[in-house]
């Protein structure tokens, strides 16, 4: 037997993005984000080395302002089970000339791989909506004016064969989902969906 010494140099796992961008909704908007893909929630001395993903993102424009803080542990309880949580805020005026919409809340999720390319995900989302109707809005929009609490749970199954998530060159993504809003709150709806891209 022989001993083999291997030196490993860890690449940078954190990033900071600040910039200006354009979109069809906003003529121009500012954005900023901090991401650490080797975060460690349980190591308060350095907060790195745990393989978790932590991100803070914000965007400010004339029509939208939003911000979010998210954290994902891909090996929750030392199992092949991803646990994620997110806190978010959004203020939008581009939906209609007759009303503005503000929403904020949090979400928690569990994602379990089935095979190499597919997984199931269970998510719970609690979200506060505020609809502000404008003075010249039709009566329909004034009937929706006010605050609404939405408590939503959703189960989805996804097959993802893409070679990359940001700029895929081949493969596709297929998703089937079912959700229910009504575990408390003011909204009581069902939703079912099938999404796909190739």
What do the predicted segments below correspond to?
Residues 1-167, 172-173:
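Gram-negative/organellar outer-membrane beta-barrel architecture
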Residues 104-110, 172-182, 187-198:
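Transmembrane beta-barrel strand/turn architecture of Gram-negative outer membrane proteins
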